Amino acid sequence: MPLADIVRPSTLDEICGQGHLFSKNSPLRRLIESEHLPSLVFFGPPGTGKTTAADIIAKRTNKQFFKINATTSSVAELRDALTASNTLSAFNGTLIYIDEIQYFNKKQQQALLEYLEDGRVTLISSTTENPYFVLYPAFLSRCACFEFKPLTPKEIVPAIQRGFLYLCKTYGEKETEEGLFESISATCGGDVRKALTVLENTYFASGQRLEIKVASQLSQKSTGYDSDGDGHYDLLSALQKSIRGSDPDGA
C-alpha cells in the first residue's frame, strides 16, 4: 500500500490546508457535523484532500457506503449501488462517492437524479475539472459545490513529517538533511500525495541519510499545466492578450 494511503488523515482536523472548508465554523464543516448532509461536489487539483474528505465523511455516517471511480467503473456498478438504496440494509440511506465524475456522460449523470431528488441517495462526487464545464446543470442544481485549493509548501510539511515518522518506525531510523521536507514540499505542485510518494522513494533510495539531491532526482516539479483544463485556456488567454498588447516578451 502506498505511503500516502497508509498515513491518510482520519479526521477533518488532520487534513492538510483547506481551512476555508474544514475550520470549526465553516459551512461545509457544519454540514458534515449535522444530520442533514446534502449531495456534494468537491473540485480541485489532485492530492488536495478530496478523496480523504469523502472517506472521513463516510465513516461519520451510518449510511450504506459505496465508492466508485468513474474512470474504471461500469454502468452496472453504478446501477448496483443505486439499486441497493432500495433494500432494507439501506434503512438509514445510501452514501455514494464517485471519484473523477467528469468521466460520467450525461446519461449516467441523469441516472442519479431520481435518487438524489427523493433522498434515497446522498452523493459525494469529486473532479479535477471545473464542475460548471463538465457536469450537467440539472445534476449541479442538486449539489453543493466546494473548491479544494492547491496546498502551500508550509501546509504539506506536516504530512511529510507524519510519513517520515511512519517509515522510521516501520523500517528503521534514518537521518535527514536539513531542509529536506521543505524542499520536497516546494517541488510537488501543491499535491500532498506526490510529496509523500517522493518521500517514500527517497527513503528507500537512500542509505542512513536522506539528502535533498536524491529527492530532487526523484521529483519533477509540476507546472500545473493541463491541456484539457482551465489552465490551458488561461494560458491561451494570456498569450492572446500579450500579442494584442504588442508585448513580445510577455508572449
List where the protein language model places each region.
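Walker A/P-loop
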Residues: M1, P27-N69, T83-A84, L113-D118
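Short glycine-rich substrate-engagement loop in P-loop NTPases that contacts/grips substrate
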Residues: L21-S26, K63-L95, K106
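Conserved catalytic/switch belt of AAA+ P-loop NTPases
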Residues: I32, Q102-S141
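A short helix-turn-beta junction within AAA+ P-loop NTPase domains corresponding to the substrate/partner-engaging
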Residues: K63, Y136-L151
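Conserved AAA+ ATPase "SRH/arginine-finger" region at the nucleotide-binding site
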Residues: N69-T71, A144-V157
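Conserved AAA+ ATPase "sensor/coupling" helix adjacent to the nucleotide-binding pocket
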Residues: R142, P158-Y171, N201-T202
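C-terminal helical "lid" of AAA+/P-loop NTPase domains
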Residues: E182-T187, R193-G207, K213-Q217, S237-K241
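C-terminal engagement/docking regions of AAA+ P-loop ATPases
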Residues: K213-G250
